[in-house]
UniProtKB/Swiss-Prot annotation:
Organism annotation: Rhizobium johnstonii (strain DSM 114642 / LMG 32736 / 3841)
Gene that this polypeptide is encoded by: mctS
Protein name as annotated: Sensor histidine kinase MctS
Function: Member of the two-component regulatory system MctS/MctR, which activates mctP expression.
InterPro entries documented for this protein: HATPase_C_sf, sCache_2, Sensor_HK_TwoCompSys, Sig_transdc_His_kin_sub3_dim/P, Sig_transdc_His_kinase_MctS
Enzyme class label: transferase
Amino acid sequence: MTLRHQIIALAIVPLVISILAITTFITWQSANLAKNSIDTFEQNMLKTKEAEILNLTNLALSAIQTIYDKAGSDDEAAKQQVAAILTSLDYGKDGYFFVYDYDGNNIVHPRQSFRHGHNWLDLTDPDGDKVIAELIATAKAGGGLHQYKWQKPSTGQIADKLSFVVSLDKWHWVVGTGVYLDDVFAQSAAANAGMRANIKRTFVIVALIDVPSVLVVFTTCMLLTFHERRMADSRLKALTQRVIDTQEEERARLARELHDGISQNLVGVRYAMDLAGRKVRTNVDDAALTIDRGVEALNGAIKEIRRLSHDLRPRVLDDLGLTAALEALCYHFAERTGIETKIDASGFTDTLKAEANTALYRVAQEAFNNVERHAGASKLAVKLWSDNGRARMTVSDNGAGFDGIKDGMSGRSGLGLRNMQERMAHFRGLLLINSSEAGTTLTAMMPKSANRPVNRQAEAA
């Protein structure tokens, strides 16, 4: 991590940590306070319900007390009279009294008449609670509350119910009534939803205050970093271009020396040996054959030197322009490799600076080298054209293609691609590579800024 990154981290990290800590504490405190309030509210509601059903049970017992006290244990008439009274005690759609005997047989149930006369001792609710058995046990133990799930008459849905039961021990009866708790839970859920909304609102307010602060600090640091990086990139590109210019100058110098010095000398040697061969041929056949071979070798050396000279700096690029240089490059490439090579430059108008022409030529040259070494192609096509004053060039082959990340940016091929990209980047141009199993297409795009000034274009014309 660089010093600047460390400074940015020291500026942002403590701020982010403090914001997260404050937000977490506020959220936790709000959640605890709301939870405690909701729990208290729910407990108060349950206590109110408990008091309500206790009072209702006492009223029912008062209504049957006289009959029950006077009746015997087997007084069927009294039992029927008490059952009728309890059936008639109705308070709302979901308010009623029920009666079971100790064996689990239903005696009174105004809302579910199908239960009358049947044994429900083994009845269980969705939670697995043996409802009737538990109610009987609670009543035998002296009476009390029991919570379970039961069908709510007004909706037909299963809901939580809280019942209070007492026993009429002389008759072995269990008398009870209850209230449904879904309204309590609904109010608790609404309060809980309100609590979550308040916490979310608090979190949003904190975020609206703190996030911009972090963004301002981060943006300021990043702007400074990007500014310095842009300056460093500019300096690096300038240095890279100076290196490229130096290389071009050295190549041009070497090309001149090879062409004007060594090549001319070798041509002289060839003519001298040719003359010697003609003089010797009349007398000594072996000497003539040896000289002919020497001439052939010298011809090969001359051809190789000229090829090297062309690779280093083709004079045709300076003398005849980019189109002619690319045509010569295609011709020599096809002759050397046997790959069918075509060029189409019919739509190109040469308005580029000399340096831009060199850059496009070197891009094509490097692309040809990659095709020869790696692609295994049988066809190669070059297209050069102008689009609204912007030079464009594509180099396409039908080779194997490559993965631009794994293959194209590794080894010598990767260095070549980087060199091509740097050459284009110097002129603010683009280098696009589209590679697949069907082949590779390389597109070089020069901006208008790479063109010669208008007055120089007129002079060139």
